[in-house]
Amino acid sequence: MKALLDLFKQVSQDEQFDAIKIGIASPEKIRSWSFGEVRKPETINYRTFKPERDGLFCAKIFGPIKDYECLCGKYKRLKHRGVICEKCGVEVTVAKVRRERMGHIELASPVAHIWFLKSLPSRLGMVLDMTLRDIERVLYFEAWCVIEPGMTPLKRGQIMSDDDFLAKTEEYGDDFRALMGAEAVRELLRTIDIDREVETLRGELKATSSEAKIKKISKRLKVLEGFQKSGIKAEWMVMEVLPVLPPDLRPLVPLDGGRFATSDLNDLYRRVINRNNRLKRLLELKAPEIILRNEKRMLQEAVDSLLDNGRRGKAMTGANKRQLKSLADMIKGKSGRFRQNLLGKRVDYSGRSVIVVGPQLKLHQCGLPKLMALELFKPFIFNRLEMMGLATTIKAAKKLVESQEPVVWDILEEVIREHPVMLNRAPTLHRLGIQAFEPVLIEGKAIQLHPLVCAAFNADFDGDQMAVHVPLSLEAQLEARTLMLASNNVLFPANGEPSIVPSQDIVLGLYYTTRERINGKGEGIFFADVSEVQRAYDNGEVELQTRITVRLTEYERDEQGEWQPVKHRHETTVGRALLSEILPKGLPFTVLNKALKKKEISRLINQSFRRCGLRDTVIFADKLMQSGFRLATRGGISIAMEDMLIPKAKEGILAEASREVKEIDKQYSSGLVTSQERYNNVVDIWGKAGDKVGKAMMEQLATEPVVNRHGEEVRQESFNSIYMMADSGARGSAAQIRQLAGMRGLMAKPDGSIIETPITANFREGLNVLQYFISTHGARKGLADTALKTANSGYLTRRLVDVTQDLVITEDDCGTSHGYAMKALVEGGEVIEPLRDRILGRVAAIDVVNPDTQETAIAAGTLLDEDLVDLIDRLGVDEVKVRTPLTCETRHGLCAHCYGRDLGRGSHVNVGEAVGVIAAQSIGEPGTQLTMRTFHIGGAASRSALASAVETKSNGTVGFASTMRYVTNAKGERVAISRSGELAIFDDNGRERERHKIPYGATVLVGDGEAVKAGTRLASWDPLTRPIVSEYSGAVRFENIEEGVTVAKQVDEVTGLSTLVVITPKTRGGKIVMRPQIKLVNENGEDVKIAGTDHSVNISFPVGALITVRDGQQVAVGEVLARIPQESQKTRDITGGLPRVAELFEARSPKDAGMLAEVTGTVSFGKDTKGKQRLVITDLEGVSHEFLILKEKQVLVHDGQVVNKGEMIVDGPADPHDILRLQGIEKLATYIVDEVQDVYRLQGVKINDKHIEVIVRQMLRRVNIVDPGDTEFIPGEQVERSELLNENDRVVAEDKRPASYDNVLLGITKASLSTDSFISAASFQETTRVLTEAAIMGKRDDLRGLKENVIVGRLIPAGTGLAYHIARKDKEALEAAEREAARQLANPFEDAPVTVGGEPEAPAADTPSDDSAE
């Protein structure tokens, strides 16, 4: 025992390990951990408070209570270390061992481990191939189980009830053996021959073809192979020995008043011991079977609730009826071991306080209250006091500090100098939520924060608190300074925009200064330089906004790269001239020579960063802030009631709207419109009226009349305070001003529907009681929404971080030339995101070629920065193939070239950057800004969306996309017959400017290659009906068109015209009526054939179509045969905001998903079933594929149409899994990126595409084995992509067949749980299931990701930690090689190790180089 302990001691010093392995403990293993058996349920003696011997807190088993002191007090002090007292049997050692020494309980009857029984799918059930219900009946003594059938016809593992058992015993006597309880299960497990089972199963797999069977067999096979590979015996799932947790981990604490607080585990252990002891006694007494059975069942239940209380049956409860916390509850959930103690620890040397604004600070500084600093830097102060000889001991130093002697403050100043501290504001949503600052000591108790970093922390000064942490070691200080100092983090990692942008007062001050006023005092004066302007301003000769001309000095670089002053004359204003003083060298004055709004200032800082570098930008931003504050104070801008100008036109607009509403009401009462239409119209009218009032108000606010110096009256931009605040972007928006001075407009009910009577008043006029009451709904809903949103957004971020946490840049270049071709993003003919924004900061995958000269303009592998992107713009290249994280070929992690620019630093990404976590934070951080609601599109909203034509927005040449197909009709019009036709407009350089979708049946008004001017109509169509157009000419022949059966005649009351409407066919007497269709016949009476085939043209009509041709009528190409009214489309609910993002990342299939064509081929319709129509696609080989489609679904294709694989054939939202299967990874990535971006763009949030791509890469990291070839995999098994590629490489190297596979798209939760690392998965969700599975497979965690390393308490393999881990591995390899060399030298005649395939044999398990820790 003692030898074992020494071994333990030595391990604890030098914790070098490379992996952690998990398995099932064998009874021998448990006994070897144990320091003695716990025999009694007693805990401590109630009088002496000493632990009882052999009890749950026994000192003999677990170690002494006090350091170096045995229980009876015979041996005390250090000199007796290691002695075992002969009186009380306690070893004299540190009391800390009570945290690590375990005991054990010898169970009188075996007990099944509940995790392997009840954690679904039941592992016991899988191994034994029995149902959970049957195993439970055996375990809880309700049934017998046959162990050895002997010569009888019974089967092994057969279940029989008591009566059956008695009958069979009478019949066969002792020929067979049957048991019940855990003994039976253990016997079954012990006698199972795993190797033979595996072989049988593999044989069955090859033989069977039924899907369900394959699935079942491969699941069982996986579990059995797990046992086989890991060397874990199946019978260990049934326990004979129960380990006992060290007592200090389940403490018993005396409270005052003689009561005790105890851990629930002690209760649970006590029950187990009591029942176990009772069972032992009953066995000795040879008690009747029925009593024993009952006692064994109770023991099983007691152990169950100790391991996982409440998993089976009713949970055990304590005295106060609350469920006891079992071992499983200790580790899972938010307050379990993983999330509470391992992933989130509280740290020393930290404090928190309220923050106040510190405008006098520099960007890298923060104000730290003296008292706080004194406490935080104590150890450093003690050290300095001792070095200076002012204190001899730590105690003396402590006294000095506590009495706050004057010398202490001087020392504090010294200690703090250049020692950065880290400030953190919760919630820390992205990496800018923790930044380092140099502390400046201040009086008072509040931390001072620099105003410009508030945006990054999302902090304001209404009572926010922040925490301070002190980095202690030199390395930590170094990293805090170089990587985390606020002045080094001036860009948002999400989009590369500056994060130190001025806001509010600063913006207002700068805006007010840089505005111009017509006819200001001293207008038109010429000044020689800025100092002259300053003098004139100080003497009151000019005002801030006066327009003047001034000569300014700017700096430009000459050939040598030196700054040369250049003088220019500028027409500008006084304020702008004064501001020009703070411009950094290298920025021209033109960037300042305009009214500075928030967006302009952001652009200014961005330009400064790109042109002048980090240092100058930080200084510039600081100066901008100081000027802004000063000038805002000088400006004295304030708000008065008079500033809210109510537009004069308001009354007229309201009167007109009321009149229109009355008109609609009249129509409704006379029955012309339905109530729904009336409601939609009313809402629409008021909505428009509200917008009109708002517009009139803004027009009135925006300008004011002034007299210029020539005495003419002109209008200039207004100096109205409210308008200036909104216009500059300092505070408020047009919508808010509209509520102050226009009208509040329409309000929503709690259920989201709009109340049709609007609030016509504004806040200046005041609301009446009804109006006030209506407004309360919206306000309350807003608050409730916010609370929900925060929780949901936090959970999304957690899942995202978990799925990407192990993605780190691990190498510089993977050498791939794959990538995605990036184009400008065009929607509805408008460029939403230009090409330059999409490729900025990426690496070119192939050479970018100048389209005019065909020369290489930019070589492959170049990082595209601002200058190169400008060049691409100038060259007119409209498509660039760039590297992307999705095509990166690095096995573990990503390479720097595929990722491109690190957005938060503005330069090439470094090896070791944790790009996964950054991506997750960038997507999760704006989550709280997204909406939570589902939009009902319909009613008023969708009417305006019915476009009926497209027009060009720019001059250029028309180009038809390859998908565009059309026919020319008799009038010479082009009629589109493609479902996904697109038109593009190209400019003179041949660059695509815009792209428009042309619906089926539209009249195309321009030709391919035609030059058009802006505003030209390209195509028009009827938005309310969808036509069916003939692609061939001939005479119409009706088929199955019978009045009253498949069609009905409709007569229009007004015009008297009759049309045929297709109705759902009535089946008469079991005769199945085919769908109504027409064929075309040529002059000879033969069917017209589809070009190039021998299919005849037949056009079938869906229900609801209006047939516009007559039987026998001649039709020409492009003529309309029928119309389908479009309002039949139901209004679809569109999921918006946060739920939509979550839905995309969870890869959920939408409920009415559209259907994509599985193959390329020709469409035809087969026989319909009752509720479904049968669609057949005949592929190019002539094989037909059938699909059944619900009748109410809208089919987008018609008979004889040729469709491409992956084209949408039934309308509905797309299913990402289908896109992946039929169109491949690139299309899927584009789909997810675009859809996620749509949600964020709606809220005005910018996120770089590559963050979303990184997440998609992680969602695609597993593959499905189709054919295992000569590999070890099982068909249908899901494995890590990297594992599969490695295995395939190995097999190919041996000239065998590699495995073939399909890509699998996993949602983020699924992907997190299916990672290689069981530690990471267990700490995320479903802890029990993950650990159970890992234990059976005997999994080994190589600690690759960040999370696993945090949990085991090592440096994470990212950033500086990556270098540390690489160096450590290299050093270990070197040492191993040196040891080997030394051994070779020592005995030169020993044979070299046998090598197989060029690799030395793995060392035996007991050699020290096996680095796995149990």
From Swiss-Prot:
Cofactor remark from the record: Binds 1 Mg(2+) ion per subunit. Binds 2 Zn(2+) ions per subunit.
GO-annotated molecular function: DNA binding; DNA-directed RNA polymerase activity; magnesium ion binding; zinc ion binding
Keywords: DNA-directed RNA polymerase, Magnesium, Metal-binding, Nucleotidyltransferase, Transcription, Transferase, Zinc
Subunit structure of this chain's protein: The RNAP catalytic core consists of 2 alpha, 1 beta, 1 beta' and 1 omega subunit. When a sigma factor is associated with the core the holoenzyme is formed, which can initiate transcription.
Binding site for Zn(2+) 2: 814, 888, 895, 898
Any Gene Ontology CC annotation: DNA-directed RNA polymerase complex
Top-level taxon: Bacteria
Region annotated Disordered, chain positions: 1378-1414
E.C. number: 2.7.7.6
Biological role stated in the UniProt entry: DNA-dependent RNA polymerase catalyzes the transcription of DNA into RNA using the four ribonucleoside triphosphates as substrates.
Catalysis: reaction(s): RNA(n) + a ribonucleoside 5'-triphosphate = RNA(n+1) + diphosphate
Cofactor (UniProt): Mg(2+); Zn(2+)
Name by which UniProt lists this protein: DNA-directed RNA polymerase subunit beta'
Gene Ontology BP annotations: DNA-templated transcription
Native source species: Bordetella pertussis (strain Tohama I / ATCC BAA-589 / NCTC 13251)
Pfam families per record: RNA_pol_Rpb1_1 (PF04997), RNA_pol_Rpb1_2 (PF00623), RNA_pol_Rpb1_3 (PF04983), RNA_pol_Rpb1_4 (PF05000), RNA_pol_Rpb1_5 (PF04998)
The family this protein is said to belong to: Belongs to the RNA polymerase beta' chain family.
Residues of the signal peptide: none
UniProt-listed SMART domains: RPOLA_N
Residues that coordinate or bind Zn(2+) 1: 70, 72, 85, 88
